[in-house]
């Protein structure tokens, strides 16, 4: 039996989400000898640290807290951290992880089955493994990737720490950030996909079941995001029916940590939340932006072909605006 080594990154705002994710992982992974968790934090309170420590110790696991600023000194002032400091934490894991590999998890995840098969993925010759993401083609172009290049979602990553150390991947991350003056599409995710190009292994989409899977078919995903290759409908349907890792990404559903979420797995989050030390604090109401509501309603009302035309016109206008702004500058 092995030790499952994992990492989360959080600040005080997301501590309760980390607790729920970690609880779900511990509940579904008794087949591991133990679980060791690295928590990279940005001013996480002692109270929240105690809650997480008590949780993992109740399963005979181990936990280690690392302050983000203590490992990210190489960035200097190269980043503005628009998504918050801790979203960049995964870039620095090789500094702190003693093991040869680690599973990084975003805090907006729930683990629903054993991760044994994922953990045993062969990473020889690869820096990283993950699930192919759903992104606009312009975002790949922005980080100097071709449309055919693999681009994964960085919310769930199986990382070959041994290779990161050997090839000084952290230094490459920092060099790319500075080269781009900190302005990189999708921030840390864009950095990872650029630097790890040609060394990325794709895995089953059951290990990162994202929100769009619940309302878009494989063909619609490929058409909307101009993807040549993606998971097929059988793979996606199997993933949403029997997810190993749920990832509550942005989309047409209000996020599950809001009381009015209609995400198909909102009930599962509430189950773990009601077991947490925060259970007496009611979940707040959430809201979708007007832009998302409009796009969702257009998709529901109009034929898909018309929706696609509207979307492409919108993208072309955005490109023109960008070009005009660049020329004016």
Language model regions located:
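Short, acidic, metal-binding catalytic loop of nucleotide-sugar glycosyltransferases
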Residues: 24-32
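The conserved acidic donor/metal-binding loop of glycosyltransferases
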Residues: 106-110
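Acidic donor-binding segment of Leloir-type glycosyltransferases
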Residues: 36, 41-65
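A glycosyltransferase accessory/donor-loop signature
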Residues: 1-4, 10, 17, 166-323
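Conserved small/polar residues in nucleotide/adenosyl-binding loops
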Residues: 324-329
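Conserved donor-nucleotide/metal-binding helix-loop-beta segment in metal-dependent transferases, i.e.
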Residues: 113-140
């Amino acid at each position: 039996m092995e030790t499952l080594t994992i990492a989360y990154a959080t600040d005080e705002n997301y501590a309760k989400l980390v607790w729920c994710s970690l609880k779900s992982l511990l509940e579904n992974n008794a087949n591991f000898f133990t679980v060791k968790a690295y928590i990279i934090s940005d001013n996480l309170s002692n109270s929240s640290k105690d809650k997480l420590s008590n949780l993992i110790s109740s399963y005979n696991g181990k936990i280690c807290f690392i302050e983000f600023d203590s490992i990210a000194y190489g960035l200097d002032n190269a980043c503005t951290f628009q998504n918050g400091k801790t979203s960049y934490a995964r870039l620095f894991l090789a500094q702190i992880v003693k093991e040869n590999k680690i599973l990084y998890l975003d805090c907006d995840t729930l683990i629903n089955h054993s991760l044994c098969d994922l953990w045993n993925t062969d990473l020889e010759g690869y820096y990283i493994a993950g699930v192919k993401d759903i992104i606009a083609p312009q975002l790949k172009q922005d980080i100097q990737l071709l449309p055919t290049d693999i681009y994964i979602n960085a919310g769930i990553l199986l990382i070959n720490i041994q290779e990161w150390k050997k090839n000084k991947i952290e230094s490459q991350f920092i060099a790319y950030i500075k080269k781009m003056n900190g302005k990189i599409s999708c921030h840390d995710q864009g950095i990872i996909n650029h630097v790890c190009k040609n060394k990325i292994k794709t895995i089953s989409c059951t290990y990162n079941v994202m929100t769009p899977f619940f309302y878009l078919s494989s063909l619609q995903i490929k058409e909307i995001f101009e993807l040549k290759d993606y998971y097929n409908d059988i793979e996606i349907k199997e993933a949403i029916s029997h997810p190993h890792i749920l990832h509550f990404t942005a989309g047409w559903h209000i996020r599950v940590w809001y009381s009015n979420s209609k995400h198909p797995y909102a009930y599962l989050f509430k189950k773990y939340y009601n077991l947490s030390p925060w259970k007496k604090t009611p979940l707040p109401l959430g809201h979708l932006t007007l832009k998302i509501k409009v796009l969702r309603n257009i998709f529901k009302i109009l034929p898909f072909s018309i929706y696609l035309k509207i979307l492409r016109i919108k993208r072309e206008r955005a490109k023109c605006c960008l070009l005009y702004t660049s020329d004016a500058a």
